[in-house]
C-alpha cells in the first residue's frame, strides 16, 4: 500500500543517475530547495531556533550553512527532509510544498534525499557490503539489483577491496565513505551533510571533500552541508549562508563572502582563515599614532591580483608589506595584504579612500612607531 501511495506523490522517485565525466554546473535559474518565511520554535523555548528564513538552494550546487553554536544550522538542514517540522513558513522541493506529505509520500521524499553524519552509524556486526545493502533490502529491492547497486557504489567511493571487511577494521575516513555509499543507494537528488568531516584529520577530510566534489560533479547532486570548519566551505562550496540566532545575516557566493565579509558574525567565523600580523608586530600596535612619523597599518582584502608597485605608489610614502598571500576560491583569486604606510602625504581618512579604490575591504589595524 505504501508503494502505491508513493507512486501517486507529485514528486516521483528519481531516475538512476548515470555517471559522466562532464562537470555539471549549478542551474542559476532553478531553485531545488526553497525556504519561504521559515520558522521553528521548540516546545518550552522562548527564542525561536529559526525565524523568517527566505533562501533558495540551486539545483546541482554545493551549498554551505555556517554559524555559531546554536545558530539553527541543524534545524534548518533537517527541515529539508522533514526530520524537523517547521512551526511557520514553507519548504519547497522542486516547487512542491512538503508540509502536507503523509507518511507514504515522506518515505518517497526521503529516498530522494541522502544524509551523512559526523558519527558514521554503521552496524558493527555487518560487513561494508552488508551496511550499504541494508537500506535496499528494507525497501524490498531484488537481489540482483541490490548487488549491482552496491558494487557500483563501493567502486564510486573507493572501497571495492573492503567489501567483506567489518567497520572495526576501517579507518575514520573509510567509515565515512561507507556512510556516503549508503546515503546514495536510492539515487538521491539531494545529499545532506551534517558535520560529515568534523571527526576526521585534515588529510582524511581533504579526501572526503574530493569525493563529495566528484559525486556532485558526476551525479549532479545538490549537496547541502553544515560545518564549523570554514576551510571546508572555502574548498568545496559554491555558495554559503551565515545564520545567527536563527536568522540569515549574510549569504552569497563563497568567494564574495570570504573575500569581503560584511557581518560581524561572519568576520568572527572567518577569523581563523584571515591573514594575521606576526605576534611581535601585533604587540607594538597602537590605536593612535605616538608620533608624526608613526606608520599606519592597513589590512586590504583584494579580488584579483593587483600590480603591487602601482598600489604602493598610489598610497604614497614608504610602504612595507608586513604579511600577505593570495588564494583561489572557485575561479576567483582572493588576496589579503597587511601593509604599513609611513610618511604618506595623505592622512588616515584619505589613505582609506585611496586603498578602497584597490580593495574590496580595507581595515585600519593600528599604528606602529
Swiss-Prot record:
One Pfam family here: NIL
Any one GO CC term of the record: plasma membrane
GO molecular function, one term: ATP binding
Cell membrane keyword on record: yes
Chief place of localization: membrane
Keywords in alphabetical order: Amino-acid transport, ATP-binding, Cell inner membrane, Cell membrane, Membrane, Nucleotide-binding, Translocase, Transport
EC number(s) recorded for this UniProt protein: 7.4.2.11
Bilayer topology annotation: Peripheral membrane protein
Stretches the record annotates as Disordered: 1-22
InterPro entries assigned to the protein according to its UniProt record, in alphabetical order: AAA+_ATPase (IPR003593), ABC_transporter-like_ATP-bd (IPR003439), ABC_transporter-like_CS (IPR017871), ACT-like_dom_sf (IPR045865), MetN_ABC (IPR041701), MetN_ABC_transporter-like (IPR050086), NIL_domain (IPR018449), P-loop_NTPase (IPR027417)
Domain ABC transporter, chain residue ranges per copy: 33-270
UniProt catalytic activity: L-methionine(out) + ATP + H2O = L-methionine(in) + ADP + phosphate + H(+); D-methionine(out) + ATP + H2O = D-methionine(in) + ADP + phosphate + H(+)
Subcellular location per the Swiss-Prot or TrEMBL entry: Cell inner membrane
Positions bound to ATP: 67-74
Domain of life: Bacteria
Self-association and partners: The complex is composed of two ATP-binding proteins (MetN), two transmembrane proteins (MetI) and a solute-binding protein (MetQ).
Family: Belongs to the ABC transporter superfamily. Methionine importer (TC 3.A.1.24) family.
Function, in words: Part of the ABC transporter complex MetNIQ involved in methionine import. Responsible for energy coupling to the transport system.
Name of the protein: Methionine import ATP-binding protein MetN 1
Organism this protein belongs to: Pseudomonas entomophila (strain L48)
Amino acid at each position: 500500500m505504501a508503494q502505491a501511495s508513493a507512486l501517486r506523490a507529485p514528486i516521483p522517485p528519481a531516475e538512476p543517475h548515470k555517471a559522466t565525466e562532464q562537470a555539471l554546473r549549478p542551474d542559476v535559474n532553478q531553485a531545488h530547495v526553497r525556504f519561504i518565511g521559515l520558522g521553528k520554535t521548540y516546545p518550552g523555548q522562548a527564542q525561536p531556533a529559526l525565524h523568517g528564513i527566505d533562501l533558495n538552494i540551486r539545483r546541482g550546487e554545493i551549498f554551505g550553512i555556517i554559524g555559531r553554536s546554536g545558530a539553527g544550522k541543524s534545524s534548518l538542514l533537517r527541515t529539508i527532509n522533514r526530520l524537523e517540522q517547521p512551526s511557520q513558513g514553507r519548504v519547497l522541493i522542486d516547487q512542491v510544498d512538503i508540509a502536507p506529505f503523509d507518511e507514504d509520500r515522506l518515505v518517497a521524499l526521503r529516498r530522494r534525499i541522502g544524509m551523512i553524519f559526523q558519527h558514521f552509524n554503521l552496524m558493527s556486526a555487518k560487513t561494508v557490503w552488508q551496511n550499504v545493502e541494508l537500506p535496499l533490502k528494507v525497501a524490498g529491492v531484488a537481489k540482483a539489483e541490490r548487488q549491482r547497486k552496491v558494487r557500483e557504489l563501493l567502486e564510486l567511493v573507493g572501497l571495492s577491496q573492503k567489501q567483506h571487511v567489518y567497520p572495526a577494521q576501517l579507518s575514520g575516513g573509510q567509515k565515512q565513505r561507507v556512510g556516503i555509499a549508503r546515503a546514495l543507494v536510492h539515487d538521491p537528488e539531494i545529499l545532506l551533510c551534517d558535520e560529515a568531516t568534523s571527526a576526521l584529520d585534515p588529510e582524511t577530510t581533504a579526501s572526503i571533500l574530493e569525493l563529495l566534489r566528484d559525486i556532485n560533479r558526476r551525479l549532479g547532486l545538490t549537496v547541502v552541508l553544515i560545518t564549523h570548519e570554514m576551510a571546508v566551505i572555502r574548498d568545496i562550496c559554491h555558495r554559503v549562508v551565515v545564520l545567527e540566532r536563527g536568522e540569515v545575516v549574510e549569504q552569497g557566493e563563497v568567494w564574495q563572502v570570504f573575500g569581503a565579509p560584511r557581518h560581524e558574525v561572519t568576520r568572527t567565523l572567518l577569523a581563523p582563515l584571515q591573514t594575521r600580523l606576526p605576534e611581535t608586530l601585533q604587540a607594538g600596535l597602537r590605536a593612535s599614532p605616538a608620533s608624526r612619523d608613526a606608520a599606519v597599518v592597513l589590512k586590504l582584502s583584494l579580488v584579483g591580483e593587483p600590480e603591487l608597485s602601482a598600489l604602493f605608489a598610489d598610497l604614497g610614502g614608504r610602504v612595507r608589506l608586513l604579511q600577505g598571500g593570495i588564494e583561489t576560491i572557485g575561479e576567483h583569486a582572493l588576496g589579503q595584504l597587511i601593509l604599513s604606510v609611513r610618511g604618506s602625504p595623505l592622512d588616515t581618512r584619505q589613505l582609506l579612500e585611496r586603498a578602497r579604490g584597490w580593495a574590496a575591504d580595507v581595515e585600519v589595524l593600528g599604528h606602529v612607531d
